[in-house]
Amino acid sequence: MWAGVFYNDEDPINGKVVGSRGHTKGVLAFDLGTNSAFWLIQSTPNFPPAGSYSFPKSGMANAQTLLCITLQDASVAQALAKQMFAAQQPNVYLASRIPVDLTNQTNDPRVLLMQDHVAQGNTPLSAVIPFFSKGRTKFMCMAKNASWGLDFYNDLVGPTLHDDLDVETWEHDPTPPPLDSDKIHTVVDMKGINL
């Protein structure tokens, strides 16, 4: 029995972004019969059109990323879905597939992701889930909700990785100065790279 959840931070009907939802896009799919799963994380704007393929013009101005991870098993997909449901509350594409047998399991976070009407809690939340791919590559999934109120890179990613970070972020305001809230690791928001 397989299922797939297509999610995005934009509303699939009107294309508007809801500010309280996580800036997150992708596909989380799993097969309980074979105990397998994959996670496609991507940054391309807009939901893909149903039944066809097109790359949005809005995605051509900036670089886009796509990363597909074959997960170790379906339980990893369940843990990732639980974090997504709690922290990011993505919009779920109507073309997602959840079998009837699973929709009766209302405590399964993979099914809860389909219940797009559930309001995100106001309790501040950040979470880190270490996991392995099927090929034994180690990953960490880090997430926060809108109520957390701290800087994602300076207060979660840098301290979790115990390292300085050079990041390129989506800028709507002037470039912030380097941050060092833990007095150990510095986060610098880059403007460009010379090769």
Give residue spans per PLM region.
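PLD/PLD-like phosphodiesterase catalytic module centered on the HKD motif
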Residues: M1-L195
